[in-house]
Swiss-Prot record:
Belongs to the RimP family. It comes from the Bacteria. InterPro entries: Ribosome_maturation_RimP, RimP_C, RimP_C_sf, RimP_N, RimP_N_sf. This is Ribosome maturation factor RimP. Required for maturation of 30S ribosomal subunits. The keyword Cytoplasm applies.
Length: 152
């Protein structure tokens, strides 16, 4: 029986999470999609206190590939890609906002804001941004998307 795309992602996540965590890294995301006519399994990793290195990606790829090959539940050929979220990474959890206090972000709610994270109130789930010399409070539940902005 063939698994759906969603089921493959869930299984890969269950396999990858403990491997990545044991290496002192965080599993940021798993994607399984067609790219340029070929299936690509993307595992995105992060490091809480530093940047992800090429070596980190190589080690994670090696370890996960061994386990995926032994389980063999992904049909056909696919490419395994391990990478970091990048400089303009999405902010998916409220903890991400707290981690990047002081950084420039773009936050989409009903409106789009571009400013610096001043503070995050974990109890009220509110994010305070400094936009054009003014502090703006945004409820985390109102955030549709957010990402770090690259400062030049």
């Amino acid at each position: 029986m063939s698994l759906s795309q969603k089921e493959i992602i869930e299984r890969v996540r269950a396999i990858a999470e403990p491997i990545v965590t044991s290496m002192g890294l965080e599993l940021f995301d798993v994607k399984y999609r067609i790219q340029a006519g070929k299936w690509v399994l993307s595992i995105i990793i992060d490091k809480l206190d530093d940047y992800v290195s090429t070596r980190d990606c190589e080690l994670v790829s090696y370890e996960i590939e061994k386990v995926l090959d032994s389980h063999d539940f992904i049909p056909g050929r696919y490419y395994l890609e391990v990478s970091s979220p990048g400089l303009d990474r999405p902010l998916k959890k409220i903890e991400d906002f707290r981690r990047f206090v002081g950084k420039l972000v773009k936050v989409k709610t009903k409106k789009t804001y571009r400013g610096y994270i001043v503070d995050v109130n974990m109890e009220t789930k509110e994010i305070i941004l400094r936009v054009d010399n003014e502090n703006i409070t945004i409820k985390y539940d109102d955030v549709k998307s957010a990402n770090l902005e690259i400062e030049l």
